[in-house]
Amino acid sequence: MSNAITMGIFWHLIGAASAACFYAPFKKVKKWSWETMWSVGGIVSWIILPWAISALLLPNFWAYYSSFSLSTLLPVFLFGAMWGIGNINYGLTMRYLGMSMGIGIAIGITLIVGTLMTPIINGNFDVLINTEGGRMTLLGVLVALIGVGIVTRAGQLKERKMGIKAEEFNLKKGLVLAVMCGIFSAGMSFAMNAAKPMHEAAAALGVDPLYVALPSYVIIMGGGAIINLGFCFIRLAKVKDLSLKADFSLAKPLITHNVLLSALGGLMWYLQFFFYAWGHARIPAQYDYISWMLHMSFYVLCGGIVGLVLKEWNNAGRRPVTVLSLGCVVIIVAANIVGIGMAN
């Protein structure tokens, strides 16, 4: 396995670790509605950071974006909006299925759809089946899916042991939402594929290969921001128990506390895709679809490890922890299989 591929896998791991930890600052926000908290964090992660970093990277910010036709930018934006819809459905999936089953089904579907649809759309899937390296990477995707399933089972055992139940368990509604979440969340993978002309243009301007994907985030995350912020603002305006004005009428120290924590959560959320771009740049072009598989499987892996570190599994008993550990090992094995496949 080459150093470039190894570093690509490593950066995807770092990005996934940030994704697994980003919600920790949000949990310390006090006396704010979820909608206000999510909006503040989202403005940082989806608008401020993508624009600021792109302004630093590009020699002429406006000239870069105006150089693309609407036919180039619109698919990138719409796939970003598609991902935004999946982001909202994610929370509803947890509500009706519970954390473990919801995450397992949603992540499993988005891993498959986001990973395999790109080569199918590009007409490269037959190449993967007919080459040794391609078959090896597909095997890695299958093993990763098995690992996600094992971790999901560990979560179910934990919830059963600790008496944790879904907020409003509804299998039919939850499964529909989980499938929708999985499919729509893959929009980020499709957006990255659609944004290749933007990456190439950034490279032509002399942007470092590690950073060429970052300017496209202005468009991708702009699409996601409109969906997420629109959802939050509509709820803040229509739901009687929610009030943006009330949330910002608290004591100034508490407002500052909440804004800083929400901004930190937004920063950590953004960093997952900052390092995703670094990892994506190191993956061989013919296997760039694997970036999504690495990100999602490592997200599950890091989520399990973070849960252990935060002692969330302390009262779950030995069996759930053993199953979780097995699932984490399987995901690590999957990453190595994919790495070997890409090297071939």
Curated annotation (Swiss-Prot):
Uptake of L-rhamnose across the cytoplasmic membrane with the concomitant transport of protons into the cell (symport system). The chain crosses the membrane at residues 4-24, 38-58, 68-88, 101-121, 137-157, 175-195, 214-234, 259-279, 290-310, 323-343. HAMAP family: RhaT. This is L-rhamnose-proton symporter. GO terms for cellular component: plasma membrane. It comes from the Bacteria. Belongs to the L-rhamnose transporter (TC 2.A.7.6) family. It comes from Escherichia coli (strain 55989 / EAEC). Pfam families: RhaT. The keyword GTP-binding does not apply. Keywords: Cell inner membrane, Cell membrane, Membrane, Sugar transport, Symport, Transmembrane, Transmembrane helix, Transport. Its main location: membrane. GO terms for molecular function: rhamnose transmembrane transporter activity; symporter activity. It is a multi-pass membrane protein. It catalyses: L-rhamnopyranose(in) + H(+)(in) = L-rhamnopyranose(out) + H(+)(out). It is found in: Cell inner membrane.
